[in-house]
């Protein structure tokens, strides 16, 4: 025996000695920049005692002489024949060796260098190498946002966590980018991360369209290391409660002869966890693969919720009947889904929420079968392991399910052998079945079925590897269960076939793209290898083993998934105390780690998950493991037909000198091709059939728009006439007429009740709908902070006021343990007893408001509660406030309580409602909300600008008149505000001007919805920054101003990107075609903003390229879709329009040349330069003709000067411009001249006297003068004419700092900043100003000492009583500016400029309050909506559109509202038109202030803007204002309509105002008042007697002629006149007529006798005087009668300059008795007493 073993050993040694020595080279197939690369080197078959030395390094294959990494030496021998080395490509080496220039097929070569290769192996070179894929990807970046969903205009807070390849914190520089829903990059920031955590925020532009935004981050030097997170942007409000639909089974089994009964549960719970009581309305439908929805008729159900739940059953018979109506059978359902929609109306407040179930599939089996872990390669003669995963249709593992396998083994020349095996799945739904494989196998066919009697079936065919190979290696796994971290995995290695002779198996373990371990194991009959699974091997790894047989490697591999467990470190969040908390309470949050770590925290309202898409989930460990596994280079479960295939599939690169793996082409694995069967289900539904007639998406959209109803009456023909695209008009008209005929048939059938509601519901579902909106006014997230935690820490947190469930997230970052995401902690915040209060956005003084707080009692006891409104100044309340109502609130129910309130003071009043329980049950709650109370009438603004020049003696004293507007409301207590500055540059461009917190956008009182208006966020701030940079004056402003300026610019950049098209052009509205003018405007500004916004130069180059496409053959530019129809931005006519546009684009293209820095853009740059030259020729030709108007001449001169056009062209343009200049004193400006349409504007010269205010010029004059100033500065620098033009421009600025509109403001600030840069001086000059006035509070004086280095004057102190003269004295040696702003409310609009523009607003509809103040909702029962299963329920229990209206309006993003009986709904009609002789400068805006307490239905406004027959370009809602944008105002009357809803009852509603104005010339406007519908409850009295009495406390009381109670008093009239209140006037007047003025009544009278006067020195008999009284007061003076009126002087004057008088509680009003009455015996004495008073008071007055 000993001899036999010796022979065998000698034989094997002899065989080994005959094998060829070689060097094996292993590496991951991808090299990552800056990341260690594990490299395996091994000697194979070298003679005993052989030592081999060498080195490995990386190099560029095309530049062999430059290494890309440092060299690493190795020494190998026959005894130590392998080594695992580490290489790295540093960034500096990657650049020096040229790797960053490898744009196509970036490869790097792994090289082993050893003299042994040439000396011992007779190679031609001492180099052996292999090509690897090069990637700049490295490390891990994880991103986190504070919410999964945001409203437009909301702030997004986010974090970036940086880790290296080993999941340890990385301090590096990263680049963060934000993309909007169109995929356009709107923000880019590069930051260094010293703590490995970066936190930042940004604001989503409020004009953003709904969609998914993305934040991505990468290491700045690693372009491929990109990581991202997404969040949803849409308009939403948080749900009050959440609805869930849970099917009884997660599938519906449909096989021939079998159909499951369909059962489901509906659950509704408030966000704070309590069940909802109410009614569920459920509908069913079908969803196909494309998400197309069709509803079943007749399957609707309505049922009560009991304890927040309801059970619904749908029988097989009912369902089949519904299918037959669609001409479908059960066999047609495969692959479709049953759609379920549930609408829940909760009983206490009638609020509605909805839910959908879209994942209920019709299936042929209740299981799915996954064979992806089964290898696609087999080893002949070794067991083949079938690995299957069985899941239920819900996605959860199916345990204990029988799996049957039929394995057919085919071998050449023999009958196929069939093996039938059955095994049940384990607890994780998996099964591992070994199949015996003969050595002669050619093919293995597997048929696998799971479950019974309706199994899931899968088939798999595995071909045997080619025969004649060197043998096979089998890797067998005794335990097929996935190991956990900390387990030891045992594997068996066995060589199969070919009698292989070798001494050792070599094996490697690869994880996360690296070789983490390399070893060898001596060959035995059954060789076992143990692998310890640590954190480095999670979440998966490849085990690769091989040996050599002769000159051929034999290999196999196995992918091992590690059970996803916790993170490497530890982070646990926990809270002390109860499961339930109260709002405002403190809670202790415990943070526990196992090492020093940074812990990032965040808390959000779980209602956000209900409001947003289910796909946007917070960061968790599953996502972390997924990111870690993304570095895995292996593809598939392992194995291969050859060793090279095995290595490649495991992600290895290999070379032994004779054979090698091919270089990898991409990071990802090749994807399997999948096909999806398409179904064409024949849905027999009228509208769907109609839609199906149109093939193109555009035509279908037009058809859908035609089907949609408008909120106003229009015929289909009228609507179609507004559709601009001809190819859209036909389908729109056809579908509109078709839908109208369907509606008519439906009306003719007289459908009513629920069935009619269902018809409309189904019709509404044809329309593309937004997601369901819901309500909230509370913080949606908090606790956004990072804490340093050393193993344990306790934080004390104070919970917000929301009643909801908060979810607290935590993520830790440790230097030793890496990243860990904790399991979130949920905090339920709830009060068993609480109240809910709604308030309107605003009300006006003396309107009447009904508060209806709702009390919720979730206790199991009835509560007697005391409710009151706390007293507050400015509100009339019952009992003066504090008077409580006693209310019984039964257990588990809610009850509303009514309070009437009348506001009497204009202010923001904090209104507090308090509810308290009894002594036995001391519960309570209080809610405080701010009620905004406005003054009556409409706001009117008036501005005056004065130049202060102490060097001119005529301007050293000024008198600012105090004249008041006769329309001003009589008791407004208004002020004049004065602003003084000695530094116009810093005042206009500093922290109080362009760099103020809101930027210039806050300085213009204009909306900002369209593309051009958006630029106001950006352009002026750039001008200000440029001025402050050039003059080095940032230090004169607050320290944070520069950061704020950059932030403003970045916000503006984000906003304008919402209007960008894919070709680089821009449009005024998101739905419009591109505009040449707007695109040029954006190009100019963004080219200047490149440094601040970090935008892509390529994007701006695309914009320049698009502009070139708009140039005509003669050099001019065209605008296929002007931003506005205003004859090219300035009221120009004829030739001026084309010239001005060409000049404007030329200026933009010139500025855009700055972005052409890279060599690749040189050809386009040359085209741009040629285009500019061509345009200059066109401009020069037109200027030479001498026919241009002032605006075209100015912009042409500037364009030619800026682009350095030929001197002869410049000279002509300059002379033409200067010939049009107008000079008055020290002012130079350009106004209306021949050729300009603005001749219609009256000339506005400069002031004739230095003490006169500067007349305010129209926007076009400002813009023209600004272009002229820009030209002068380039043409001759800071000379006299530039001084004069800048002086005129400076004085045209408004009180806030802007000018008239967007364009003139942008250009004026651009010109002034350029001038101020040129004229900047460090010389300090002073200005002394004294202002004095005598007003309501006596004499007031201010002395100011200013200098030209100060930011601003003390304008916050400079307030003077409106109507009082202000005297100004000026001294010093510096010029300055004084601006006066007067803001007051007016009674009517009769003096507005409604000659050119006209607007009319009418309101129809009335309010019906059907709910009594003491009505309650016992046990949340909803008796008006009986359950379907109630046998006593009437057939049609629902008002026809009650459910539908709630659903439709909420579908359109409306806030929840109570049911229709509680709503106050009106219909608005807004009509506009203009004088046909007057042209507009373009876009017009109708600003409609809604009646108090109302908000417009967004659904109606969206229909006006979003359909093909667009009526309004855009709309905005700001508080009580609705802004409607019109492209133009027609000469004939055009009307639009929408509905508005008043959620909180308001009585005695006062008229509101509406204004139509020209956006580019806001002075051209028309303003009107409109009122509530007559005979409407809106005009009714809501207050209780006591509150009414309080509200009327300031009203005058009419003394009836000869009242008996007063006759007994001696001298009662004289006491009133002379003692208290001591009147200031006394007249006997005759009333001529009564007139309504906003919230007042005006009585026009004629004086018959003057008894007394103070201020009214011109009062005399037969003169006219006006008396005013509030419309809310009862006083009515009858025309034709005479009255004795005494009282206090008024603050306002009529049109003749005579005082007007307000009648109030300090007024005496007494009707004069007739002569006939005085002749009666009974009244003779009283009349004598009255006549005595008139005689005595009229002649002697008061004797005190």
Swiss-Prot record:
<feature type="disulfide bond">
    <location>
        <begin position="1595"/>
        <end position="1673"/>
    </location>
</feature>
<dbReference type="GO" id="GO:0043025">
    <property type="term" value="C:neuronal cell body"/>
</dbReference>
<dbReference type="GO" id="GO:0005576">
    <property type="term" value="C:extracellular region"/>
</dbReference>
<feature type="disulfide bond">
    <location>
        <begin position="702"/>
        <end position="728"/>
    </location>
</feature>
<dbReference type="InterPro" id="IPR001840">
    <property type="entry name" value="Anaphylatoxn_comp_syst_dom"/>
</dbReference>
<keyword id="KW-0399">Innate immunity</keyword>
<keyword id="KW-0095">Blood group antigen</keyword>
<feature type="propeptide">
    <location>
        <begin position="676"/>
        <end position="679"/>
    </location>
</feature>
<dbReference type="GO" id="GO:0006956">
    <property type="term" value="P:complement activation"/>
</dbReference>
<dbReference type="Pfam" id="PF00207">
    <property type="entry name" value="A2M"/>
</dbReference>
<keyword id="KW-0165">Cleavage on pair of basic residues</keyword>
<protein>
    <recommendedName>
        <fullName>Complement C4-A</fullName>
    </recommendedName>
</protein>
<dbReference type="GO" id="GO:0070062">
    <property type="term" value="C:extracellular exosome"/>
</dbReference>
<dbReference type="GO" id="GO:0005886">
    <property type="term" value="C:plasma membrane"/>
</dbReference>
<feature type="modified residue" description="Sulfotyrosine">
    <location>
        <position position="1422"/>
    </location>
</feature>
<dbReference type="GO" id="GO:0006954">
    <property type="term" value="P:inflammatory response"/>
</dbReference>
<dbReference type="Pfam" id="PF01835">
    <property type="entry name" value="MG2"/>
</dbReference>
<dbReference type="InterPro" id="IPR050473">
    <property type="entry name" value="A2M/Complement_sys"/>
</dbReference>
<dbReference type="Pfam" id="PF22661">
    <property type="entry name" value="CO4A-B_CUB_C"/>
</dbReference>
<dbReference type="Pfam" id="PF17789">
    <property type="entry name" value="MG4"/>
</dbReference>
<comment type="subunit">
    <text>Complement circulates in blood as a disulfide-linked trimer of an alpha, beta and gamma chain.</text>
</comment>
<feature type="disulfide bond">
    <location>
        <begin position="1583"/>
        <end position="1588"/>
    </location>
</feature>
<dbReference type="GO" id="GO:0030425">
    <property type="term" value="C:dendrite"/>
</dbReference>
<dbReference type="InterPro" id="IPR036595">
    <property type="entry name" value="A-macroglobulin_rcpt-bd_sf"/>
</dbReference>
<dbReference type="Pfam" id="PF01821">
    <property type="entry name" value="ANATO"/>
</dbReference>
<feature type="modified residue" description="Sulfotyrosine">
    <location>
        <position position="1420"/>
    </location>
</feature>
<dbReference type="InterPro" id="IPR001599">
    <property type="entry name" value="Macroglobln_a2"/>
</dbReference>
<feature type="modified residue" description="Sulfotyrosine">
    <location>
        <position position="1417"/>
    </location>
</feature>
<dbReference type="InterPro" id="IPR009048">
    <property type="entry name" value="A-macroglobulin_rcpt-bd"/>
</dbReference>
<feature type="cross-link" description="Isoglutamyl cysteine thioester (Cys-Gln)">
    <location>
        <begin position="1010"/>
        <end position="1013"/>
    </location>
</feature>
<keyword id="KW-0770">Synapse</keyword>
<dbReference type="GO" id="GO:0005788">
    <property type="term" value="C:endoplasmic reticulum lumen"/>
</dbReference>
<keyword id="KW-0395">Inflammatory response</keyword>
<dbReference type="Pfam" id="PF07677">
    <property type="entry name" value="A2M_recep"/>
</dbReference>
<feature type="glycosylation site" description="N-linked (GlcNAc...) asparagine">
    <location>
        <position position="226"/>
    </location>
</feature>
<dbReference type="GO" id="GO:0045087">
    <property type="term" value="P:innate immune response"/>
</dbReference>
<dbReference type="GO" id="GO:0030424">
    <property type="term" value="C:axon"/>
</dbReference>
<dbReference type="GO" id="GO:0006958">
    <property type="term" value="P:complement activation, classical pathway"/>
</dbReference>
<feature type="disulfide bond">
    <location>
        <begin position="635"/>
        <end position="669"/>
    </location>
</feature>
<keyword id="KW-0732">Signal</keyword>
<keyword id="KW-0597">Phosphoprotein</keyword>
<feature type="disulfide bond">
    <location>
        <begin position="703"/>
        <end position="735"/>
    </location>
</feature>
